[in-house]
Amino acid sequence: MEINVQAIVIDNGSDTCKAGFVGEEAPHSEFPSIVGIDQNDSYVGNEAQSKRGILTLKYPIERGIITNWDDMEKIWHHAFYNELGVAPEENIVVLSESPLNPEENREKMAQIMFETFKTPAIYVENQAVFSIYNSGRMTGIVLDSGDSASHVVPVYEGLALPHATSSLGFAGCDLTDQMSLLLNDLGYNLEREIVRDIKEKLSYVSSDFSWEINDPSTLGKSYELPDGQVITIDKELFACPEVLFLPYAFFGTNLDGIDKAIYNSIMKCNDDIHNDLYGNVVLSGGSTMFPGIEYRMYKGLTQLAPSTTEIVINAEPDRKNSVWIGGSILGLVPNFQELCIDKEDYDEYGPSFVNLVKSFREQNHQNYYGEN
């Protein structure tokens, strides 16, 4: 059934909700994925953030998974009516989901969209698949690292391969914690948002950590605090994002770095697609924005992969918004509406239909699911 309405894209991040219209190059709106409540009212996004001192703040998405549906509904309502100024019943809604989103969560997303917001059709897709679309390819392996969740997901011909998908035990919030500890060691006890700002503006990935950490000529960078005090930060700037590559050195646990996690994921896929995956290693999400990460990833994978392997790291300048942009691109394909689940299907088959559609797609790629 063809639906003559526009489509909107919502990327549901643990830290930030990004919303906008299909065909646009960037989200129309970005706001914190938080709900603030007092005795009488609730506030969403930036308004909740600005009143955080007098509100109880709630975060409905934890480590990429929606855990509070009432508050998530408030965030979607805010995105539709306040940020985009649209009526959801007049728009197809494209939604991102965590690579390891439980089936019951996917059904709940569909239920709220159709029964509460009366949207005519939806499309729910793995965040990593959207990131692949933004790379201009249909096959590759994605490292998506946001504020509270990181995943490695191989994608073959537009379909994520779940048996080789992994969730990493660290993300941007953990890097912020690490930066806070490093700054505390220097005698700076700073608010978390200031620490996060330092991390995002000044940190970088070292090309050779063991050498640079012992190099006395490493130059520090200055940062002006809100009170006007200027502090100088040195090795902490590259020690913080080193968590991505050497998490076990910081957390004391048996965690793989992002390069080793990508290698392990590829090794779980059939041999005949290894070169395709190595040929499009896609970096996605805000925690992949550190300068130097592209070279370090290439260096790490070169040491792990067979010597004749061609490795291509795809680090788009706009990769912080890769998921949203990929959803926007999807909405432009000629048969987009045929891929959607419409209200008629939902009314006939119920919420479980969204999982039946996903299973059908996976069955068409069964040949690439076997482990080596």
Curated annotation (Swiss-Prot):
Swiss-Prot/TrEMBL catalytic activity: ATP + H2O = ADP + phosphate + H(+)
Disulfide bond sites: none
Record GO biological process: phagocytosis
Keyword Cytoplasm: yes
PANTHER family reported in the protein's UniProt record: ACTIN (PTHR11937)
Function: Actins are highly conserved proteins that are involved in various types of cell motility and are ubiquitously expressed in all eukaryotic cells. Multiple isoforms are involved in various cellular functions such as cytoskeleton structure, cell mobility, chromosome movement and muscle contraction.
Descriptive protein name: Putative actin-27
Source organism of this protein record: Dictyostelium discoideum (Social amoeba)
Lineage per the UniProt record: Eukaryota, Amoebozoa, Evosea, Eumycetozoa, Dictyostelia
